[in-house]
C-alpha cells in the first residue's frame, strides 16, 4: 500500500507563502506595503502580516496580487524575576465574512500565563474565533518541550525562524518537533521568517498545495498539505513496499527522521541527489511510528517534509 504525504499528488499548484512577519504596525522595520511588495518580488503567493497582538486583514499594497492571510502574533512572557521564558503563537484565520472572530486592527494585551496549563486558555479563545495556531521559536523562547508538549490545538510549530537563525544562530527547533512527534503529538512543521529587519524576510516559507484563496490555503495547512523550505524543492514523499521514497531538486544531503533507530542518511558532495529510497520495513517489520525527511542543498539551505504517520 502506498502512503503519500498530503502535500503531494494533487492537481493544485504548490503556492509559496509566508506565515510570520512584522511591520511598522508593531516592532518591524518595514512599512506594511513595502513588506508585501518585497515578498511578491520574491515569488510569494500569500502572506500573513502577524504584528504583535494587532490583527490584520488588509493588503496595504493593493496593486500587488498577494493573498493576505488574516492574522497576528500573540505573546506571553513568564518568570520575569531572574530572566524569562516566552510562549509566542502565530494566529491565522479565515476572512471576516467566513466567521473570523477578530476585527481589523483589534489589539490584545500580552498573556499572563505562568505555565502551559494556564496558557491553554488563551489558545482556546483564539481557536474559538476560528483561528489556527502555530507554536513559535521554542529554542529562542527557552522553552524545552516539556513546557509546551501538552498544549492542545496547535496545527504546527516553527522548525525554522529566519530572525532567530540570523541574529542568534538558533535554528534547532526540529529537535523539539521530533520529541513531540515521538510522544504521539500529531503536529506539522513550518519554516518562517519572523521578519523584523528587512534582511530577515524571504528566507523561510511553506509550499502549500491549494487554490490561491484564504479558505483553501488554511484548509491545506490544517491538513498538512504542505512542506517547509529555505530553498530546496520537494516533489514527492511517500512510503510503499517497505521503503520511504523522496523526489526533490538537487541536494547534497537527505536524512530520514523518526522516533526510533536505525537512522538513515545519504550524502553527495556534488549536490546532485534528486531521488532517495530508504528501507524502513513493512508491517510488523517496521518499527517506526512516523517518518519524515530533511534535505540540505550544497549552499546549506534546508527543506522539511511533514510526517507520514505509520502507527
Protein language model regions, located:
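Alpha-helix boundary recognition
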Residues: 40, 127, 181-182, 222
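Short, hydrophobic/aliphatic alpha-helical segments
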Residues: 173-186
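A metal-dependent hydrolase metal-coordination microenvironment
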Residues: 2-132, 136, 143-145, 150-153, ...
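C-terminal functional module detector
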Residues: 1-14, 183-188, 193-311
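Short, well-ordered alpha-helical segments in soluble proteins
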Residues: 158-164, 181-184, 225
Amino acid at each position: 500500500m502506498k502512503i503519500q504525504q498530503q502535500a503531494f499528488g494533487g492537481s493544485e499548484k504548490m503556492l509559496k507563502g509566508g506565515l510570520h512577519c512584522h511591520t511598522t504596525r508593531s516592532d518591524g522595520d518595514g512599512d506594511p506595503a513595502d513588506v508585501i511588495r518585497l515578498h511578491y518580488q520574491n515569488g510569494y503567493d500569500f502572506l500573513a502580516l502577524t504584528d504583535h497582538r494587532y490583527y490584520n486583514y488588509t493588503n496595504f499594497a493593493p496593486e500587488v496580487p498577494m493573498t493576505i492571510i488574516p492574522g497576528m502574533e500573540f505573546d506571553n512572557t513568564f518568570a520575569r524575576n531572574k530572566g524569562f521564558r516566552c510562549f509566542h503563537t502565530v494566529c491565522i484565520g479565515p476572512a471576516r465574512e467566513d466567521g473570523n472572530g477578530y476585527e481589523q486592527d483589534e489589539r490584545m494585551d500580552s498573556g499572563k500565563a505562568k505555565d502551559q496549563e494556564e496558557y491553554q486558555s488563551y489558545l482556546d479563545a483564539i481557536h474559538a474565533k476560528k483561528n489556527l495556531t502555530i507554536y513559535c521559536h521554542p529554542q529562542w523562547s527557552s522553552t524545552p518541550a516539556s513546557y509546551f508538549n501538552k498544549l492542545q490545538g496547535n496545527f504546527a510549530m516553527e522548525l525554522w525562524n529566519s530572525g532567530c537563525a540570523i541574529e542568534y544562530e538558533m535554528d534547532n527547533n526540529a529537535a523539539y518537533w521530533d520529541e513531540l512527534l515521538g510522544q504521539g503529538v500529531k503536529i506539522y512543521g513550518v519554516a518562517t521568517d519572523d521578519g523584523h529587519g528587512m534582511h530577515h524576510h524571504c528566507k523561510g516559507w511553506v509550499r502549500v498545495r491549494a487554490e490561491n484563496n484564504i479558505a483553501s490555503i488554511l484548509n491545506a495547512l490544517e491538513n498538512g498539505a504542505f512542506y517547509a523550505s529555505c530553498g530546496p524543492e520537494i516533489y514527492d514523499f511517500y512510503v510503499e513496499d517497505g521503503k520511504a521514497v523522496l523526489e526533490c531538486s538537487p541536494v547534497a544531503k537527505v536524512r530520514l527522521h523518526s522516533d526510533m533507530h536505525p537512522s538513515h542518511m545519504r550524502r553527495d558532495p556534488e549536490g546532485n541527489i534528486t531521488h532517495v529510497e530508504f528501507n524502513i520495513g513493512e508491517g510488523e517489520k517496521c518499527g517506526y511510528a512516523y517518518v519524515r525527511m530533511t534535505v540540505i542543498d550544497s549552499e546549506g539551505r534546508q527543506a522539511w517534509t511533514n510526517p507520514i504517520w505509520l502507527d
